[in-house]
A protein has these predicted regions:
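Extended alpha-solenoid helical-repeat scaffolds
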Residues: 1-204
């Protein structure tokens, strides 16, 4: 019955937040096996995991498990709506994590990976519904610690590569402002910032 299947799916997805890593890992593997056998269920399973990922009260371990699972989904042009919703969620979670000062974490890396995977299948991902999160990222790229600014720029770099010319120009202004500030010259490990500069120069 549909009700029983929905309840079972919710139960398995909730196990992604189990404090025992082996249990969370098994839940992720089980969900992937279900999708391997029934690929048409991808939007339904993804929606349940997204609801879990954005649920208040989840710890960072649970959130990382959910994002890691979503990063393994098979995406295509036929799943453009799903891809767009994933991009919007990744951007919102990334912005929230950076604002909370959670830098240099596996979660940020997983979110960047997710954006990279989903954007090619989500041509309309950067619509009006994502404007608030994108504006927040630009705000972070001009304020806070230098590490916060660079992490925000790293995501904006990926969004700008798939956005319009206006977004690209805005990103480049923010990048050059970061490079020109005094803090940039004091960094002992400027690799990420230098990589962003190299990518920007190569694209021009």
């Amino acid at each position: 019955k549909p009700e029983r299947e929905a309840a079972l799916l919710e139960m398995v997805v909730n196990k992604l937040g189990d404090p025992e890593p082996s249990v969370a890992g098994r839940a992720s593997q089980l969900l992937l096996e279900v999708l391997k056998a029934h690929r048409a269920m991808t939007p339904v399973v993804a929606a349940e995991v997204q609801a879990f990922a954005t649920r208040a009260g989840n710890g960072r371990r649970a959130l990382y498990a959910a994002v890691s699972f979503l990063n393994q989904l098979f995406l295509s042009s036929q799943l453009s709506e799903l891809a767009a919703s994933l991009v919007a969620m990744y951007v919102a979670l990334f912005s929230a994590a950076v604002q909370a000062g959670e830098l240099q974490t596996k979660l940020l890396a997983a979110l960047l990976t997710g954006v990279n995977r989903a954007l090619p299948y989500a041509p309309g991902a950067l619509g009006a519904e994502s404007e608030k999160e994108v504006d927040a990222l630009f705000g972070l790229s001009h304020a806070g610690t230098f590490s916060t600014r660079v992490q925000a720029l790293a995501l904006l770099d990926k969004l700008a590569a798939n956005g319009d010319g206006k977004l690209r120009a805005r990103y480049l202004r923010s990048l050059y402002a970061a490079v020109s500030c005094d803090d940039a010259r004091k960094q002992s490990k400027p690799a990420l910032l230098l990589n962003l500069v190299f990518r920007a120069a190569s694209a021009e």
